[in-house]
Amino acid sequence: MSLLAIGINHNTASVELREKVAFGPEKLSLALNQLSTSSHVKGGVILSTCNRTEIYCDVRSASKNKVIEWLSQFHQVSLDELKPSLYVHEEQAAIRHLMRVACGLDSLVLGEPQILGQVKQAYAEARENHAVNPATEKLFQKAFSVAKRVRTETEIGGSAVSVAYAACTLAKHIFESLADATVLLVGAGETIELVAKHLAGHHCKRMIVANRTRERALSLAQQFGADVIALNEIPDYLAQADIVISSTASPLPIIGKGMVESALKARRHQPMLLVDIAVPRDIEPQVGKLNDAYLYSVDDLQSIVDSNIEQRKVEAIQAEAIVSEESATFMSWMRSLQAVDSIRDYRKQANEAREELLNKSLQALAAGGDPEKLLIELSNKLTNKLIHTPTRALQTAAEQGEPAKLAVIRQSLGLDDLN
């Protein structure tokens, strides 16, 4: 078992690079199949969100560069472009990183709970595609239990802070009151649902949900009293929106500069706030150059969320201590597995020797042998059989002048306790 975690996130890579290496739903099954059937990988999970793309896998020795090369080739991104933003964690560092991610300690918004759901979804998709092996299974199950422990023992998730919350906070900063604002939500996934929940608390005048799948949009709209439109109807409704918040899995922008320009003319250039929290981006970056259009991307939210992080930093110290403890414990368990086969083989060898000598003694006893003599003979032969290999190892280490090896063997045999 050799654990590896590689990836990029909002701290190391720009939105542009994160867009290039994002695994959309249409690519994920193929990627998991390629990864798990590679001769270098025993099992793996791919986590791809707006803020990070990460690969967690159980690899064969000296295979980390092969996984990095695969990521580069799969997305047709050169290693020269990828490597400066790439982080690589191995063994306990990989374990610790996944636990930190699952606990929200590595998120754009410290302690945000949504990432745990995303990690669980990534794990479920890997299982569905038969990409998970026993090592990654154990790793992710442990990460989930650690995240639960952190939520139980700390208050890191005590306040509603998330990218979705930050988007709503931005809207509140720009529009003093949302009571007169019409909000267009593009997408109907988990992030948009969180945005809708936050907005509902501010009683905005009207909420419109635009989504590719009408059924999902209707489900969301019914919760919050919103109207529903199709994505291709956005140009007809955009002028009515004071605030646009978008988060879809579309590989191409949904809202372009020309569309917004037309909407602003129809609005007589009343200001419009557009918040794009999708990766790849849903709104063309050129929209930000238009007068009266205020465009913010995921990266722009960083400055907003900073003010919400302070209250969680103290709790994060305790959470980090839990992660350090749990990652060390898991690493110790992993190391103990390396001895399992050896212990099993050693026990088998000792039992076979015992059974062989015992059977011979029982046969001799049945033939009328002296029980006392046979018992002494059995104990002597069993002792000699069991100490033969360790004795040879001690002799060889001494003859070859290897005091360190000799000391290890003595310690293993418990001889140091006799002095």
From Swiss-Prot:
NCBIfam families assigned to the protein according to its UniProt record, in alphabetical order: hemA
Role description: Catalyzes the NADPH-dependent reduction of glutamyl-tRNA(Glu) to glutamate 1-semialdehyde (GSA).
Catalyzed chemical reaction(s): (S)-4-amino-5-oxopentanoate + tRNA(Glu) + NADP(+) = L-glutamyl-tRNA(Glu) + NADPH + H(+)
More details: During catalysis, the active site Cys acts as a nucleophile attacking the alpha-carbonyl group of tRNA-bound glutamate with the formation of a thioester intermediate between enzyme and glutamate, and the concomitant release of tRNA(Glu). The thioester intermediate is finally reduced by direct hydride transfer from NADPH, to form the product GSA.
EC number of the protein: 1.2.1.70
Biological process terms in GO annotation: protoporphyrinogen IX biosynthetic process from glutamate
Residue(s) at site: Important for activity: 97
Pfam families per the UniProt record, alphabetical: GlutR_dimer, GlutR_N, Shikimate_DH
Record's subunit section: Homodimer.
Binding sites annotated in the UniProt record for substrate: 49-52, 107, 112-114, 118
Organism: Vibrio cholerae serotype O1 (strain ATCC 39315 / El Tor Inaba N16961)
Alphabetical keyword list: NADP, Oxidoreductase, Porphyrin biosynthesis
Protein name: Glutamyl-tRNA reductase
Highest classification ranks of the organism: Bacteria, Pseudomonadati, Pseudomonadota, Gammaproteobacteria, Vibrionales
Family classification: Belongs to the glutamyl-tRNA reductase family.
Catalytic site: 50 (nucleophile)
